[in-house]
Amino acid sequence: MKQFIYSIIFLISINISFSQTKELVLKKSFETNDLTTLNIDVDNVTIQFKESDDSKIRLDYSIIFKNNSDELIYKVFKGIKAKVSKNKNVINLDVKNSMYLGELHNLDVDINVYTELISDYFKKYKENKFPHKTKDFLLKEIDFSLGTDMHDYIKAFKKKYPNKNLGEGSKRFEQKFIINVPKNLKIKIKSLHSRITFNYNINKPIKVSAFKTYFKFKKINNNENEFNLNMGVFQTDRIIGGNYILKDVNKVLIGSISNAKLSTETSKIQIGEIGKDVEFNDFNSKLYFYNFNKNFETFELKGDYSKLYFYNKKNTVSLTAYGNTTAFVIDKQKASFKPSKDGKKFKMLEKKVKNKENYFGHINLNITHGIIEIKPQEKEH
C-alpha cells in the first residue's frame, strides 16, 4: 500500500514539473566590436544582462508558462511585440509588451496572505529608526533585493518560514529574457514598467532614460554615464563617474559613490560610502549618508526642503552648513534657524575636527527649508 501511495506522489510531481512549458519569443546573435552600440527601447519587460565570453551579443527571450493553456499562451503572445535588428554598428532592440506581461507588482503570494503581510510590513516600517549601516551591510541588502522594500519583506519572510503555505500569486507565467553582452559594448536604454538587472561590471558608457523601472547593477564605471530615472527602483554596488537625475525614485541603494553628480527630487536615497568629488543638488528628498571614505576630501550638497541624515563618527569629518529656515537634530538635541531679515543665507552650523590624524574630509552644505540630523552610531549593521 505504501509503495502504491509513493507511486501516486511521484506521478503527481512529474505532472507538475512537466506542466510548465517554455515558448520562444526571440533568439538572435550578432557580432560586435569596440564601436558597437546596443539601443534598447522596452515596455513591460524583465531583462537579465550577463557578460559574454566572446565578442558576440546573444539575445534569448522566452515565456515560461506554469500551466499549459492554449488560451493563456494566445493572450500572452497577443500582447508581445519584439524585434531586433542591426544597422552597421548599431543593434536595435525594440520590445513593446502590454501591461498584462508586466512583472513589477508580481509578489508570488496569495492575495489574502499579501494583505496580512503588507499590514505587518507597515507596522515594522514605522518602527524603523534607520540605524547606522556599514557599506558591506548595504551591499548585502542590494544583493538580496528583488525590487521594492515590500518585495524584499516577502522574500525574507519566506526564507524565515520556509514551510509556511503562502499560496500562489495570480501570475501564471514569467518572462525569461537573457542578454549576453561583451564588455566593450556601449548601451543606451529607454524603458517603461520594466525590470533590468546587470550581473557584470559596466566600464563602457551607458545612457538610461526610464519610467517606473527597477534597475539593479554591479559596478558602473564611466565619466560619460547618464541616467534619467523617474519613479521605480535604482540599486547599484558602486558608482564611479557620471551624471544621475533621479525624480520620485522611492528606493535608491548605492553601495559607494565617487566622481559623480546627482540631481535628485522627492526620492529616498541610501548611500553606504561617499568618496571623492561627489555633488548633490536636491529638492525634497530623504538622504541617508552612512559613511564617508577616508580620503573623500570634499562633499558638496545644495538642498531645498531636503531631509539629511548623517552618522556621527567623531573627529573624522568637518561640516559647514549655510542657508536658512532649517532645523538641526544633533545627538537628539534640536535647534532651528529662521530666515534672516534680508532673506540671505548665513552660516548656521560649523563642526570642526580637532585631531587631524584621523581627518577624512569636509562636508559643505547649502540648504534651505531643510532638516539635518546627525545621528549617533548607537547600533551598527
PLM feature spans:
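Structural recognition of beta-strand segments within beta-rich domains
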Residues: T32, N39-V42, K188, E300-K302
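Short, surface-exposed interaction patches in beta-rich subdomains
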Residues: F234-N243, K247-H381
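Transmembrane beta-strand segments that form the barrel wall of outer-membrane beta-barrel proteins
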Residues: L192, F211-K212, N230, E265, ...
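Bacterial Sec-dependent N-terminal signal peptides
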Residues: M1-L26
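Acidic (Asp/Glu) and glycine-rich low-complexity loops/linkers
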Residues: Q20-D34, K50-S191, T197-N203, K207-A210, ...
